[in-house]
């Protein structure tokens, strides 16, 4: 990571959460923080589950979600319905024609996001 203090990281999003509360934005309804691309490492090879980049997110996304929620805020996260995100991280890889493998993987990824205590937004990046 070229600039660990300026790149997407738990440190950055914790700071955003602090500012939303301390500067009064949360009281005015700004209660959502959305993590964009570049939060993922490669899938866990043993389980095929999505996993956060441990360098950027020590303790993973659940630790960040717990911090954000402790401030009375909500945490959302971006992913892509294709094989990869625009930055090349793993996507949800749902085929255009549903099959049991794609459906099972999508369900597993949704369960992973739910276990992290977050909401996922899904886009599509054609690259």
Question: What is each of the regions a protein language model found here?
Answer:
Residues 2-5, 9-127:
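Aromatic-lined carbohydrate-binding/catalytic grooves of carbohydrate-active enzymes
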């Amino acid at each position: 990571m070229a600039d660990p203090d300026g790149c997407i990281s738990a440190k950055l999003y914790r700071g955003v959460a602090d500012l939303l509360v301390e500067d009064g934005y949360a009281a005015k309804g700004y209660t959502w923080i959305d993590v964009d691309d570049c939060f993922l490492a490669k899938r866990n090879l043993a389980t095929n589950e999505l996993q956060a980049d441990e360098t950027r997110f020590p303790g993973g996304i659940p630790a960040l979600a717990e911090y954000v929620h402790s401030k009375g805020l909500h945490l959302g996260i971006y992913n892509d319905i294709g094989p990869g995100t625009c930055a090349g991280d793993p996507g949800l890889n749902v085929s255009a024609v549903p099959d049991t493998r794609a459906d099972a993987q999508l369900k597993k990824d949704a369960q992973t996001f739910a276990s992290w205590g977050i909401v996922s937004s899904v886009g599509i990046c054609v690259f």
